[in-house]
Amino acid sequence: MMMMGDSFGSIGSSMASLFFLWATIQQIFPDHLKITIKEFLLSSFQQLCFAQRVSDHFTNLFSPYVEIHFPESDEYSFNQAFSAIDTYLDSKATDKTKHLRGSQVKESKGLVLKRNEAKVRDEYKGANVWWERVVDNDGNRYYKLTFHNRARTLITNSYIKYVVEEGKSIIVKNKQTRLFTNNLSTQWVFGQNMWRSIEFEHPASFQTLAMDPKKKEEIVNDLIAFSNGKEYYKKIGKAWKRGYLLYGPPGTGKSTMISAMANLLNYNIYDLELTAVKNNSELKKLLTATSSKSIIVIEDIDCSADFTSNRIKKESNSRERYGKEDKDENSVTLSGLLNFIDGIWSACGQERIVVFTTNHLEKLDPALIRRGRMDMHIELSYCTYEAFKILAKNYLDLDGDDAHPLFSEIKALLEETKISPADVAENLMARNQQIDVDKSLNLLISALEEENQYQRSQQEKKKSKFKIFG
């Protein structure tokens, strides 16, 4: 009993000392030092024999400061407030912090300065606040905002809203389009790190895209109408999203079209690799981790998974075996993808575009590409004369039907030869940075004649086979 009494006496003495020291600190030190000293005293107090919970109650009882945490991610999605706060605090770097880090943006002569400190002090309408970037034991990141209780109304009703809105406006102003690709789920960390990204610097634009000008204008108008359609989609009661199906032979510009879309709208691109997704649950999580103002792309969807028109036939021919496989979690199903596109979970974000590409439209399951799901079907076909003129302007600075005497010969060859815009561009591209118009056009004519001869020979072979088996 005596030992216990001595123990409590020692603890009581320590607490009394801490109370006295804290009262002295309140009178002597400025606010920005009080936070640091308070944390030191609390850590010292927590080393006493009292449990952590008692220490926390003590802190809440006697501390005049309030804390608010802003986690990087919620259960199913990224916390947009976190990135806005992070951007806002970075904008204060040169004014509020002494430790900075510099980085150089590509193709820029200047340096971008960012803070290299976890703690930042800010002031708002006479109230002092302290921000701290924290990583907990599980690797989760969050911002901790600390302020005096007397400023609670000002901070919660006005300051936080100001910080988030200011951060979002800076993000929009300085936005750099990024290209994302999904990581394997084994690389995910507590619901984070689902996507990795790089800066997107593809120069494609609709002005340089080799396709029929009228079709191009129709696509551009549709994209702009969508990006400005927030109130319209709200009025008709539909999620603010749109689907585009790009189909055609290889080399006809499907990937370039996606790049031009992103550059026109300043949207991020999420290149979804379905073969890296185990099941529908993972697909749903990946969707909720994408941002608004984005293009979600599944290229060569006929090769990504079994979403072809033969899917139903395969299922009916293997019911006995399929009974076991139906429970296999390591697969993305058609219903899971359809829910991804336009199910309930597809409305978890705004201003999203979904793009499918395929070389074989006839192979896809009709349910996947029906109108309303893929709102616009865009055929990217072989190079036409109109597309050639755009390429000639891009590569050779030749503009108009009468820009060169060889144009009429090229026009005639294009009308009877199937060749992709990529192959045409390859023949027009300057060698050794030297543009030789006549040489480039003659190279193209030779390539067209060779391809035309090959295609005719293939047609003759087919005719002869038909006669034999006929």
UniProtKB/Swiss-Prot annotation:
GO CC terms in record: plasma membrane
Binding site for ATP: 248-255
ATP-binding among keywords: yes
Cofactor dependence: Mg(2+)
SMART domains, per database record: AAA
Protein name: AAA-ATPase At5g40000
Reactions catalysed, as given in the entry: ATP + H2O = ADP + phosphate + H(+)
Intrachain S-S bonds: none
Keywords per UniProt: ATP-binding, Hydrolase, Magnesium, Nucleotide-binding, Signal
GO molecular-function terms, A-Z: ATP binding; ATP hydrolysis activity
InterPro entries reported for this sequence: AAA+_ATPase (IPR003593), AAA_N_dom (IPR025753), ATPase_AAA_core (IPR003959), ATPase_AAA_CS (IPR003960), Mitochondrial_chaperone_BCS1 (IPR050747), P-loop_NTPase (IPR027417)
Enzyme Commission number(s) of this protein: 3.6.1.-
A Gene Ontology BP annotation from the UniProt entry: response to stress
Classification lineage: Eukaryota, Viridiplantae, Streptophyta, Embryophyta, Tracheophyta
Pfam families: AAA, AAA_assoc
Signal peptide coordinates: 1-30
Organism: Arabidopsis thaliana
PANTHER family from the UniProt entry: BCS1 AAA-TYPE ATPASE
Homology family: Belongs to the AAA ATPase family. BCS1 subfamily.
